[in-house]
Amino acid sequence: MLWNPTRFCENGYTPNRHPEWASALSMLVFYPCIARALQLQLYATVALLGTNMLSSMSTHLSQGMAADNLFFVTVDYIDVVTTVLILTVGLAEIAARIVPWLNAGIIAVLAIVGLATQGLSDELSTQWSGSVVAALFTTTTMSVYVVCRRCDGRGTLTLVVAGMLVVLAACAKLLADEPGALGLPVDEHGCNAHTASWAHALWHLFSGLAVLTLLGLITR
């Protein structure tokens, strides 16, 4: 039986009255033991990606990378790790909604392995706006669930704030990559070095805040 958000909002949640939640990872917000199991899974993901990050950082240090560039590489990897966590929770929630009897953890593990085996290199993290994609993905798939779960306006307000952060992140990314499209002066390569440095930092700031906002919304 599919989850009925209206009935849930009217009657509140109790395991006996809503047995369809029993096989879904979506009940992790109500059952600490399942939340703990998911935490362990996420810790394993962070450990996997952290090893990759340290390996890349050591390579850059050995090649004499400047400290500011090393900072941006670190931020890139933090974005990728956060993206994996968001996609893991999001895919698990979607699987629990569509096929309640399916072990959504299997899909989550496949998502982690699929992303990890692609290398998660600097090229991936800089060319693919992972945080923005994850924020849009999560906002779309989780909005009804989050808003109806608590039956208050906080979920809606948080979604609005996250959406604004996503828009700001997208604008900063456009400013960093395509300054000419916004009427700014560019060199022969189509770049504006002065604008690109701080616009890139703003992109990381806004996209990271959007992801963290949504992560707090999902787990509250």
List each language-model region with its residue ranges:
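Multi-pass alpha-helical transmembrane bundles in non-GPCR membrane proteins
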Residues: L2-R220
